[in-house]
Amino acid sequence: MKQLSSAEVRQLFLDFFKEKGHTIEPSAPLVPNNDPTILWINSGVATMKKYFDGSVIPDNPRMANAQKSIRTNDIENVGKTARHHTFFEMLGNFSIGDYFKEGAIVFAWEFLTSPKWIGFDPDKLYVTVYPEDEEAKTIWREKIGLSEEHIVEIEDNFWDIGIGPSGPDSEIFYDRGPTFGDDTSDPELYPGGENERYLEIWNLVFSQFNHNPDGTYTPLPKQNIDTGMGLERMVSIIQDAPTNFETDLFMPIIREVEQIAGVKYGHNQENDVAFKVIADHIRTVAFAIGDGALPSNEGRGYILRRLLRRAVRYAKVLTINEPFMYKLVPVVGKIMNSFYPEVENQTDFIQKVIRTEEERFHETLNEGLAILETILKTAKETNEQVIKGADIFKLYDTFGFPVELTEEYAEDHGLKVDHAGFEAEMKEQRDRARSARADVKSMQVQGELLANLTAKSEFVGYNATEHVSEILYIIQDDALVDEVASGKTAQVIFKETPFYAESGGQVADKGTIESETGLAYVEDVQKAPNKQNLHRISVKEGVLKTGDTVKLAVDKVKRRETIKNHTATHLLHRALKDTLGEHVNQAGSLVSPDRLRFDFSHFGQITEEELTKMEEIVNEKIWEQINVVIEEMPIAEAKELGAMALFGEKYGDVVRVVQVGKYSIELCGGVHVRNTADIGLFKIVSETGIGAGTRRIEAVTGKEAYRFVTEQENTLKHTANLLKATTKEAPQKVEQLQADLREVKRENESLLSKLASAASADIFESPEEIGGVKVIAKQVNAKDMNQLRQFVDNWKDKKIGGILVLGAVQGEKVNLISAVSEDAIKAGYHAGKLLKEVATKCGGNGGGRPDMAQAGGKNPAELATALDYVSTCVKEQQA
């Protein structure tokens, strides 16, 4: 067997399929682009769904990739098994309506057994097949020459993820020999069984059926191939490693952790689990942050936070009690740099994010652990088997403990956790967290009509807004028709069109279609599978027919305003990077006639000064009257120019480059102004956070910017008039009013304090004596909880001692407060427990510390009853 590094195995795979006529697709970012069905790219095929369901026709039906992936449905097993990972690489080859079973099987066998490639001993390889897949069995037996003993029928060998393409599959296994299992009585010791001897290395999926919504299966219009080879497994065989973790993908990380911890790997099972957890999780977190995800309490951000905190928990096993994960980022970058330069290129930013997250967790970890230990100890002392949901929620909400982390600690003590109770406390957050356990979701059912419309349609709208063309196709109700009449809607493809199809954030053009016999409006334009512009139209007069010569006219006003916003978006993108840092990546955009919206990745808040700076930069570029140059060039040349690519997009060999002087260079298929002066004016309307690590700027240009400024100016004038000041004097006048208001509030608080003190003389006079304990339970006039606290302060100052409970009516609700002196606490009284009981008598609840608590109620009419109940509670406790 050849001795190969992981980088060499990856490259051999891609070189092999390139030689076989496949286009090598770049690895997509882990954060899905325009696919809301999954949190992460979790397989090689996840980026190919649009080809498999026929919504897009690829330029080359043969494709291959090495795709970084994240799966989080088995986090608890990572580190405890030989091959569970949260981050992994999937090598795959794909055929969309080209070669099928024989081609896929022959390619796989050649790559695995040819001395030119991997060079495995054929006798070491076994395959599994679906029992009813006679075609695959015949190919393995007759074309490849495998004996019956090396072909195993497995009922589960059928790939089906719900509605969409499905079909049988064939898995290839490598026999690692009797060292990894030789018990002939073991019912799982066979290829496809649960054992360490026969290791699955490649899965060949033969997509030949549509799984229809009604549950039936029908043959696909185009049969497809989808294969997946786990790089980590493959490398473990080639490098003769007992588990994936002893390969060159993980060992450099483990060695670095050894240096940090002063503990050796391979000498203690508990320590080794910790090493593996850390090595796996840092790969996931580093790549995910590099691809635009950031730690948070929801969605994919919750997964990152959970992984980081799980790694920190395991680091304690290795006596690492300080932030350290960030130190491993350069190691990950170095291991993967030959194919994935993104981690090494963003090391500083990724380290900053991880270190900040670690420091935050360490601030609360020890306190949280102390509370958890108390909870676990109490549970054991009281013979409880389950940790309460309320306790789990407190650890999560206050100390940032993921419920899974609490569960792992509980399991270590032989206890379970109350998941249902926790979910009742925090249903929304748990729902979002559970959504992270999604796998590849159903694709659309593969359709034929649009995929079979192959006539070319040319977009001529870069240089024209009007054009005479011919109708090629009219589609109504998913069928080709010859004509569409007044009052009806349809989809139309023209031989040439000036109408821009929605893409890259730019909205579709609208406009009119005129022929000798009819008039229609274009309401939307989208891309068809074969890249034609597909126009959704409504016919207003007469009839339109296939073959008609028509005049197409784009709405010039809307187009003009749209392109101003599009070029301004490019300028803003560059200004964001210049102001905030190169880590900023586009996360989405909308370019419409009336505004632009730009979503981007950024860790932290944006200051007013930064927003002002960005706005100034964009306007300076507008006023510099820079020509916008657009040209097509090879992608390699565009990269040499430093062109920015849209994060997550895939590009062909020739790309369209939009250059705004030397300031902004981007790959873009949209329509733009000829000179930045055409934009006129740029104003930022708002800046907000829309999710973990994602922020949004909305802005306007041209007439809309003028309108926005005018509205702001009118608002300022109106405010100045109310203040009886000029617009220049208005800010100073507002500051003075604020100062006056603060002084009035201060004086008011002072008066209220004096009133409370005066009222206290009556309230605190002659407290009730119950078993030697002074008890005061009275209703007072207090507008809010702050005033009630002032009464408590006065009670403490007078050193009356005992128990105090006060209530006040505030509108339709009740405020309650209680206090217990130190000697009463020693006697067993607890302010929080007492007030919790009292509050129930007026429709409320609450609680607090032994010395002080507060509560609310919903029934003011029962306040007197609640206060009378205080004496009863004290007497019951003394009984």
From Swiss-Prot:
Record protein name field: Alanine--tRNA ligase
Compartments (UniProt record): Cytoplasm
Keyword annotations of the record: Aminoacyl-tRNA synthetase, ATP-binding, Cytoplasm, Ligase, Metal-binding, Nucleotide-binding, Protein biosynthesis, RNA-binding, tRNA-binding, Zinc
Co-factor binding comment: Binds 1 zinc ion per subunit.
The species this protein was found in: Listeria welshimeri serovar 6b (strain ATCC 35897 / DSM 20650 / CCUG 15529 / CIP 8149 / NCTC 11857 / SLCC 5334 / V8)
Entry function: Catalyzes the attachment of alanine to tRNA(Ala) in a two-step reaction: alanine is first activated by ATP to form Ala-AMP and then transferred to the acceptor end of tRNA(Ala). Also edits incorrectly charged Ser-tRNA(Ala) and Gly-tRNA(Ala) via its editing domain.
Stored InterPro entries: aa-tRNA-synth_II/BPL/LPL, Ala-tRNA-lgiase_IIc, Ala-tRNA-ligase_IIc_anticod-bd, Ala-tRNA-synth_IIc_core, Ala-tRNA-synth_IIc_N, Ala-tRNA_ligase, Ala_tRNA_ligase_euk/bac, DHHA1_dom
Gene: alaS
Record's GO cellular component terms: cytosol
